[in-house]
């Protein structure tokens, strides 16, 4: 793989999956083959895929509900609250998928420009620093093969959960279609999350490269060539900040919708698992699959927040090191002017990875999600205890009342 095709080599397969899932209408190619593009064929394919997945999933759910035998097998043993949880999950996975598609469609032009700038980024760096060696193989190993492994596990857990939830051998075709479409809908959350993480890591690695090159140039002899290269690194850091701002614009809303979906499904499944533990009933595979689902969503929330924090830390370190330019070349007016201009620019450009438009994506996001999840689970468990106490009180009251015989009319003579 040529170095000019590094972005496609690392992330091209992930973007192909986004297109196959119907999430985007963009197809990514190397610059020699025209670069990223969107045409009527990709749009038609995406619209067909979206319609097929959402309509087929909702149709299979309605089929299960309308058939008395299948409905009794799936929902007859569940409490009203757990039924509401499963209903919410069916609606939320479809709504989140639609939100993803609409958000990315609205940002399509911006997305195309972002991909084009990332494809051009490395080639421009090699023109000034030809000795730089990009480790594309490591990035591909981490994101493409990592996505395949996690995706295979998620597919296995989701399909197994649906088959175990149906609790009925009747309606196998509808069960297969429901399991397949549900898995595609829910896996879209993780797939887009991996692409978001990959681009954050792309920017983080370039900011680290700026620091490594600066350390070398700060120790070099004072010459015009050194100052020209340092000036390029200033521009390179600004381009990274611009890419980060564009990344937030393209993926910010989708990332917020994805984390909210992770929060809701983990809250619901953790409550169902807690209910099973409190009632001291024997476990069945359905709850094991729920626990594995929670583990996958936990993994996504943790690594997304972690990469957001690592990007923020790398950016701060890079900005701080650039601000030391005038200190290393104290006798140069060009260094002093460049540092002053950069400090002024830095005051007005404090980009960081965001969830939505206001929430910083950092380690604190993990606390925010799990603190909220714990609070809601505690409330639901308290509600479960209250329902159990009411039920026990009703049973006790029934045992305390003994009917001896029929009571006659009561008059004033009594």
Swiss-Prot record:
GO biological process: chemosensory behavior; male courtship behavior; monoatomic ion transmembrane transport; sensory perception of taste; signal transduction
Protein keywords: Cell membrane, Membrane, Receptor, Transducer, Transmembrane, Transmembrane helix
Top-level taxon of origin: Eukaryota
Residue ranges of the TM segments: 6-26, 41-61, 143-163, 183-203, 250-270, 292-312, 365-385
Membrane topology according to the record: Multi-pass membrane protein
Biological role stated in the UniProt entry: Probable gustatory receptor which mediates acceptance or avoidance behavior, depending on its substrates.
Expression sites by tissue: Expressed in neurons of the terminal external chemosensory organ of larvae.
Residues in coiled coil: none
Species assigned in the record: Drosophila melanogaster (Fruit fly)
Keyword presence, Metal-binding: no
Subcellular location(s) per record: Cell membrane
A GO CC term attached to the entry: dendrite
Family in the record: Belongs to the insect chemoreceptor superfamily. Gustatory receptor (GR) family. Gr57a subfamily.
Extracellular compartment segments: 27-40, 164-182, 271-291, 386-414
Molecular function (Gene Ontology), one example: ligand-gated monoatomic ion channel activity
Cytoplasmic side: 1-5, 62-142, 204-249, 313-364
Name listed for the protein in its UniProt record: Putative gustatory receptor 47b
């Amino acid at each position: 793989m040529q170095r000019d095709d590094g972005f496609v080599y690392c992330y091209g397969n992930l973007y192909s999956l986004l297109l196959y899932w119907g999430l985007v209408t963009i197809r990514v190619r190397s610059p020699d083959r025209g670069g990223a593009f969107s045409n009527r064929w990709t749009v038609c394919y995406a619209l067909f895929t979206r319609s097929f997945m959402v309509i087929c999933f909702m149709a299979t759910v309605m089929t299960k509900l309308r058939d008395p035998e299948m409905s009794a097998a799936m929902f007859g043993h569940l409490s009203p609250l757990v039924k509401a949880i499963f209903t919410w999950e069916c609606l939320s996975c479809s709504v989140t998928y639609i939100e993803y598609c609409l958000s990315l469609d609205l940002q399509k032009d911006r997305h195309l420009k972002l991909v084009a700038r990332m494809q051009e980024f490395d080639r421009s760096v090699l023109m000034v620093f030809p000795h730089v060696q990009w480790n594309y193989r490591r990035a591909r190993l981490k994101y493409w093969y990592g996505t395949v492994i996690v995706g295979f596990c998620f597919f296995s857990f989701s399909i197994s959960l649906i088959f175990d939830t149906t609790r009925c051998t009747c309606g196998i075709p509808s069960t297969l279609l429901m399991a397949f479409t549900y898995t595609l809908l829910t896996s879209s959350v993780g797939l887009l999350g991996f692409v978001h993480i990959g681009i954050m890591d792309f920017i983080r690695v370039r900011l680290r490269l700026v620091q490594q090159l600066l350390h070398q140039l700060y120790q070099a002899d004072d010459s015009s060539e050194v100052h020209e290269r340092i000036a390029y690194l200033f521009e390179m850091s600004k381009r990274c900040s611009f890419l980060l701002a564009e990344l937030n614009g393209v993926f910010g809303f989708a990332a917020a919708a994805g984390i909210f979906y992770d929060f809701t499904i983990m809250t619901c499944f953790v409550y169902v698992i807690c209910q099973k533990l409190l009632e001291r009933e024997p476990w069945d595979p359905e709850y094991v699959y729920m626990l594995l689902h929670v583990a996958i969503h936990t993994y996504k929330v943790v690594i997304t927040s972690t990469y957001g924090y690592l990007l923020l830390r790398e950016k701060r370190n890079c900005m701080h090191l650039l601000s030391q330019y005038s200190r290393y070349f104290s006798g140069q007016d060009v260094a002093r002017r460049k540092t002053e201009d950069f400090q002024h620019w830095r005051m007005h450009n404090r980009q960081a990875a965001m969830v939505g438009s206001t929430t910083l994506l950092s380690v604190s996001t993990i606390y925010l999600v799990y603190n909220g999840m714990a609070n809601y689970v505690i409330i639901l468990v308290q509600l479960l205890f209250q329902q159990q106490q009411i039920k026990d009180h009703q049973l006790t009251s029934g045992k305390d009342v003994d009917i001896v015989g029929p009571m006659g009319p009561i008059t004033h003579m009594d």
